[in-house]
Amino acid sequence: MARIASVNIPDNKRLVVSLTYIYGLGPAMAAEICNKAKISKDKKVKELTDQELISLRNIIESEYKVEGDLRREVTLNIKKKKDIRCYQGLRHIRKLPVRGQNTHSNARTRKGKAIAIAGKKKAVK
């Protein structure tokens, strides 16, 4: 397995698919990296030479924010929104959907497991 940006990428897959295993790289960005490195997208990772792997590493490290740096930036952005107490920050604090989704009938994933209201009984006449 080749190691790029501290991630083991699979050998038996095409280069474009393997690069998407790195957090922050999608299919379009992976294709762009292959073009910059002048490597065929259809080439398997196990067929790459050491020189090609080095060029891929250099391109990714110098031009793109991936893995730990990107995760850190995202968490800092969320923390900043929480600190200034803007609308999105408040939604993060309350663990509700941030981008305007409905919460009346959906949003179970974000809100967590449904909790029954204990002791609530219908009023008896």
Swiss-Prot record:
Organism per entry: Rickettsia felis (strain ATCC VR-1525 / URRWXCal2) (Rickettsia azadi)
Q: What is this protein called?
A: Small ribosomal subunit protein uS13
Cellular component per GO, a single term: cytosol
User: Could you tell me which PANTHER family the record lists for this protein?
Assistant: 30S RIBOSOMAL PROTEIN S13/40S RIBOSOMAL PROTEIN S18, SMALL RIBOSOMAL SUBUNIT PROTEIN US13M
| Highest taxon, organism lineage | Bacteria
Its GO biological process annotations read: translation
Sum up the protein's function in the record's words: Located at the top of the head of the 30S subunit, it contacts several helices of the 16S rRNA. In the 70S ribosome it contacts the 23S rRNA (bridge B1a) and protein L5 of the 50S subunit (bridge B1b), connecting the 2 subunits; these bridges are implicated in subunit movement. Contacts the tRNAs in the A and P-sites.
Instruction: Tell me which UniProt keywords the record has, alphabetically.
Output: Ribonucleoprotein, Ribosomal protein, RNA-binding, rRNA-binding, tRNA-binding
User: How does this polypeptide assemble, per the annotation?
Assistant: Part of the 30S ribosomal subunit. Forms a loose heterodimer with protein S19. Forms two bridges to the 50S subunit in the 70S ribosome.
Q: Which Gene3D superfamilies match?
A: 1.10.8.50, 30s ribosomal protein s13, domain 2 (4.10.910.10)
Family classification:
Belongs to the universal ribosomal protein uS13 family.
Q: Known HAMAP family for this protein?
A: Ribosomal_uS13
